[in-house]
């Protein structure tokens, strides 16, 4: 098998995301992966290919964050975690709809744990899709066995009171429970603290120069500079299995779709050191509008709508 050259990340990079899958067993009406399109139909790499690709990364102190969709639905999830070089830190974003005993059997507590101001396993709770009592019990069970877990919840404007009830339950159990800003248009209002407010869901499109601080890898191994490109499947920088590493990681690059940016890239948030004021991308040289944005929406139309969760089903 051909040896792949190392991928060396720029010094200013802050985050590595490995989207093992865009699929999920939950059916949240506000899920960003289902704002139209066929994301979940994206080809999945095998576990061996993920291991081969991720192990070429020269990540320094940046953990590889396994996420999705729901990363644990990948049929090779456990072998991927076990196969990543031990000197590379791993974080995990998950809804934790899994067998905790199987998880503990296959992943030692110390493998997804590092010295950081937040949990390495960040669990999401989704109202109407999960039983909060069962989820909190599962989190507590793993914490009591030495795993680094916390709960992160999208602070949906329709569920504010319920979210705080669950938050108090978690805090009473000694579980770290944090709120994440709800992002995007909802009932005629755009939500989220944005560094470039007119970059998201704008009525007009502009050109600009953009520089990212993140390495985003989709389920097929394609590398993207931002979530907007990732979800739209456009402007790939290459593939994690390409013999030659991408030559333009973290460089200033022209972009013709300012106005179609994704909130995850533009929002003001904490960096990996929990210092507030960071955003995933920097933007400069914004032009005057040159076209209307055909993707502008007053309200997100989600392809799921409101459906019951499909828990316990593993994707192929």
Positions of the model-derived regions?
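Generic structural signal for well-ordered alpha-helices
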Residues: 54, 78-81, 104-107, 135-140, ...
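Core AdoMet radical
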Residues: 15, 35-45, 60-74, 85-103, ...
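Radical SAM enzyme [4Fe-4S]-AdoMet core and its adjacent flexible, acidic
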Residues: 120-239
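Short, surface-exposed loop/strand segments
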Residues: 17-19, 30-38, 43-55
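Residue-level signal for mature regions of secreted extracellular proteins and peptides
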Residues: 17, 21-24, 201-203, 248, ...
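Flexible mid-to-C-terminal extensions adjoining Fe-S/redox cofactors in radical SAM and related proteins
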Residues: 2-14, 34, 229-316
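N-terminal pre-triad scaffold of radical SAM enzymes
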Residues: 4-32, 62-66, 213-217, 221
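Short cysteine clusters
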Residues: 24, 28-31, 208, 221, ...
């Amino acid at each position: 098998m051909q040896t792949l050259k190392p991928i060396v990340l720029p010094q200013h990079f802050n985050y590595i995301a490995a989207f093992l899958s865009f699929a999920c067993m939950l059916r949240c009406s506000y899920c960003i992966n289902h704002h139209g399109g066929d994301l979940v139909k994206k080809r999945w790499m095998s576990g061996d290919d993920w291991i081969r690709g991720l192990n070429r990364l020269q990540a320094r102190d940046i953990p590889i964050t396994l996420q999705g969709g729901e990363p644990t639905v990948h049929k090779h999830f456990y072998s991927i975690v076990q196969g990543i070089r031990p000197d590379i830190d791993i974080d995990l974003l998950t809804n934790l709809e899994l067998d905790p005993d199987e998880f503990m059997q296959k992943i030692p507590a110390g493998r997804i744990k590092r010295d950081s101001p937040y949990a390495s396993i960040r669990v999401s709770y989704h109202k109407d899709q999960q039983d909060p009592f069962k989820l909190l019990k599962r989190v507590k069970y793993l914490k009591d066995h030495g795993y680094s877990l916390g709960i992160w919840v999208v602070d949906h404007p329709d569920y504010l009171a319920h979210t705080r009830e669950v938050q108090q339950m978690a805090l009473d159990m000694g579980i770290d429970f944090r709120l994440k800003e709800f992002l995007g248009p909802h009932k005629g209002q755009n939500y989220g603290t944005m560094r470039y407010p007119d970059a998201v869901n704008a009525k007009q499109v502009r050109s600009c120069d953009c520089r990212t601080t993140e390495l985003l890898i989709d389920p097929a191994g394609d590398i993207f500079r931002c979530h907007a490109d990732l979800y739209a499947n456009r402007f790939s920088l290459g593939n994690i299995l390409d013999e030659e590493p991408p030559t333009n990681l973290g460089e200033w690059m022209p972009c013709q779709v300012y106005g179609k940016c994704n909130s995850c890239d533009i929002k003001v948030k904490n960096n990996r050191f929990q210092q507030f004021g960071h955003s995933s991308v920097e933007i400069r040289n914004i032009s005057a509008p040159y076209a209307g944005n055909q993707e502008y929406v007053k309200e997100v139309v989600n392809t799921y709508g409101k459906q019951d969760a499909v828990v316990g089903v593993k994707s192929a």
